[in-house]
Design a protein with these regions (language model features):
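PRPP-associated nucleotide enzymes
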Residues: 1-201
């Protein structure tokens, strides 16, 4: 007998619906496209780098709203594992396949909280020779910021939504590899992460 879970019942409340997300992603894509067309680096297509795994849904939706030529790649920097709180010691665990020397790179993140993971990625990309690095984060949990966001060259920060200091899942974001397939962003009920040793991020 197959037992199925109703993941929707694990959600305390919905923060952003699928329609609200779709509208905001379209706005972000338009803003990035406009900036790229007026950039000094416009002769070479920008490289959009999705941060695996949480950003994959946002990344796919974003690039499909961008009409101009772009290149895409993925990177992974791990700091969460199966807990709800960042370990504070991220490391690059999936390297880029594309050459990024003298190219403008846009990092596409699901959520920025402490800033440690993002700082690790940006520093890594600069060491690889990127001429400038921008960041497009679906959610920004600025209340938890520990490391300031430092971009270089023509780098710019694009933010989808300001996120309250609660643990969110859905739209590619998970807890213990669940909830990525929810079409919205919601707050996870405490009883579904209460067995973890960490408090929610």
């Amino acid at each position: 007998m197959v037992i199925t879970e109703n993941l929707h019942s694990h959600i305390e409340r919905v923060l952003w619906s699928s329609q609200e997300i779709s509208d905001r992603v379209r706005e972000l894509a338009n803003e990035i496209t406009t900036d790229l067309s007026s950039s000094a680096n416009s002769s070479s297509p920008a490289i959009l780098v999705g941060v695996a795994t949480g950003a994959f849904v946002f990344f796919a939706d974003l690039i499909r709203q961008m009409p101009d030529p772009i290149s895409v790649d993925f990177i992974r920097s791990e700091s969460y594992g199966s807990s709800t709180q960042s370990s504070g010691s991220p490391r690059i665990s999936l390297q880029l396949k594309l050459e990024i020397t003298n190219r403008h790179v846009i990092v596409v993140e699901d959520i920025v909280d402490t800033g440690r993971t993002l700082s690790c990625i940006v520093e890594h990309l600069m060491m690889k020779g990127a001429s400038s690095v921008s960041v497009c984060s679906f959610l920004d949990k600025s209340a938890r910021r520990e490391v300031p966001l430092e971009l270089t060259g023509e780098g710019k920060y694009y933010r989808g939504f300001e996120c309250p200091d609660v643990f969110v899942v859905g739209y590619g974001m998970d807890f213990a590899e669940k909830y990525r397939n929810l079409p919205y962003v919601g707050v996870l009920k405490p009883e579904f992460y209460a067995s973890s040793n960490d408090s929610p991020s």
